[in-house]
Regions:
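Phosphate/dinucleotide-binding and metal-coordinating scaffold of catalytic cores
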Residues: 1-220
Length: 220
């Protein structure tokens, strides 16, 4: 709830979250989290064109273009967009691999996405080449990234915003001069415009008031 809210505040697509109590034949089954499905309706809220390919990364990096799950257009599967990205990474200039990807990846979106992953300590996301989604925006003809499976956030408050990256794109971002400069500028912008501690604490308190009675009931 808190983490996805921060992504949305920053303009990065992320599911909406709700809570519900479930009962079957009047037998209570407790409190559950409702996570918005990343469906065509979700894409319509964020994009003017929704016919692009939507991929899910699960312990696979973007260069493994045959292995990523395709969550849309399954009846007419075509991975040319992802294959082009993978080939561009293979051919990237060793001296400047980050900027050479600008024709295939929305660099602003990706930088914002990775910076937010570090801020909320989404250690199990693209940082580990896991739990991420990427959408090929037909309007810009570039890939955009957004979070997925963000259920282990804020676990290490001492986390380093320059932590090691397994993802080939995030390594190119953080470990090259031009990418690192862009990353630091984005981190500064997010800390000034999105990371509002009073607002975050207020959301936490609001959520606590909402679900605490039901958690107590579940534990009884």
């Amino acid at each position: 709830y808190i983490g996805y809210g921060l992504f949305r505040d920053a303009g990065v697509p992320a599911p909406r979250i709700g809570y519900a109590t479930v009962a079957v034949n009047q037998e209570p089954y407790g409190l559950y989290v409702q996570v918005e499905a990343v469906s065509s309706d979700f894409l319509k809220r964020w994009y003017s064109k929704t016919e692009g390919n939507l991929y899910e990364g699960s312990f696979r990096d973007v260069v493994e273009w045959r292995e990523l799950d395709l969550d849309s257009n399954q009846g007419r599967e075509n991975r040319r967009d992802l294959r082009r990205l993978a080939k561009s990474i293979e051919k990237a200039d060793d001296n400047n691999p980050w900027e050479s990807l600008a024709d295939y990846v929305d660099l602003g979106n990706f930088t914002r996405f990775i910076a937010l992953e570090q801020l909320v300590n989404h250690w199990d996301g693209y940082t580990q080449t896991n739990n991420y989604r990427m959408y090929y925006n037909p309007e810009t003809k570039k890939f955009e990234f957004f979070p997925h499976g963000a259920d282990q956030l804020f676990q290490d408050v001492r986390g380093n915003i320059f932590r090691d990256q397994r993802g080939i794109l995030s390594r190119a971002l953080i470990q090259t001069d031009s990418g690192n400069q862009r990353y630091c500028q984005m981190m500064k912008q997010l800390l000034e415009q999105v990371w509002d501690e009073s607002k975050i604490k207020s959301r936490i308190a609001e959520t606590y008031r909402l679900i605490h009675p039901y958690i107590v009931t579940d534990l009884e």
